[in-house]
Amino acid sequence: MIYDTISDMLTRIRNAYLVKHETVYVLNTKINRKISEILKKEGYIESVNLSTNSLQKLEITLKYLGNQKKPGITNLKRLSWPGLRFYSNYKDIPPVLNGMGVVILSTSKGIMTDREARANKVGGELLCSIW
């Protein structure tokens, strides 16, 4: 049984990039769906679809750059996990690579990126960082 679906999703994506898979399947939860939609919107992955094999899986198509198939994501890092939560107000959200990366937060207004949280002036739990 998987207790931390976010860490599981990030690990599956990271491992799929390491072996250069085209697609990866992750559990279909609301938070995984929202995080994968943010990754798509930010341009880190190609697409997100419900799996045709099972309704409990999300099919994520990974993005590679150039002919050498460089991964679209350099690093995925889980910032807050079930045993240790990290919270931040909108003024103290840490920048990732001076704004080149993205921090994904869980706020009272939903799951959003660090830029959206600063614009809406809401803080929340730091879920993960991507660059």
Curated annotation (Swiss-Prot):
* Gene Ontology biological process: translation
Cellular location of this protein?
Plastid, Chloroplast
Q: Which domain of life is it from?
A: Eukaryota
Q: Which family does it belong to?
A: Belongs to the universal ribosomal protein uS8 family.
For the keyword Ribosomal protein, the answer is: yes
Q: Where are the transmembrane segments?
A: none
Keyword field contains Ribonucleoprotein: yes
Going by the UniProt record, its keywords in alphabetical order are: Chloroplast, Plastid, Ribonucleoprotein, Ribosomal protein, RNA-binding, rRNA-binding
- The protein's name in its UniProt record: Small ribosomal subunit protein uS8c
Tell me a Gene Ontology molecular-function term this record carries.
Answer: rRNA binding
Corresponding gene?
A: rps8
A single GO cellular-component term from the record reads: ribosome
Q: Quaternary state and partners of this protein?
A: Part of the 30S ribosomal subunit.
Tell me, in a sentence or two, what this protein's role is.
One of the primary rRNA binding proteins, it binds directly to 16S rRNA central domain where it helps coordinate assembly of the platform of the 30S subunit.
